[in-house]
Amino acid sequence: GNWLVGIDISGSMEHAMQPGLLLAAYLARQVRDKVLLCFFNHEPYVKDVTGRTYAELVEMTKLIVAQGGTSIGCVVAAARELQFEADAIALVSDGGERHPPDFGSAYRAYSAWMGKEPPVYLYRVPGDDPDWLSARYGGTLPYQCFPVEKSINEAGVVALAATMKTKRYGLVQEIMDTPLLTMEQALRPPKQWRIDYAIAT
């Protein structure tokens, strides 16, 4: 499916860039469809990063400076303006909003235009503002929040990203579809153990 990734570059969010680029690069490698990257403060700056590597994204964004206010809603408003239909949305931000459009109203307009509600994942980095996004919309939108430290590494981002799905209950369905082991399979030692035992004896 198509992914929309928003990275907060408002004044207090200079540390959102690294996890945001790691996330965008991971999705760009993994998904078969498009990845649209939107840097945002009170305005959106949009790039198609489908197929890009982390090194390419770092080079592409080295002149971006964290400054300005915050409008998380402008991410989905920009996607709608570009006629980009996202199957899922990932945001890297502290969840604070100070400028219109607010995320809730922009998301509902975007969803109505597409005829579907894409799941929203917030990678919440530390910031100066309270996490208004979770407080306002956590119970009303298909929404999940991942608290993220300032210094998260690639392995940490990938571990979180691997749980994201383009359907609201995609991970639950994947777990339910996984065949259960029989008692014999569960108690059977791994093949490598049997090889090591045979060599030892």
Region annotations inferred by a language model:
Residues 1-201:
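Acidic, glycine-rich A-domain
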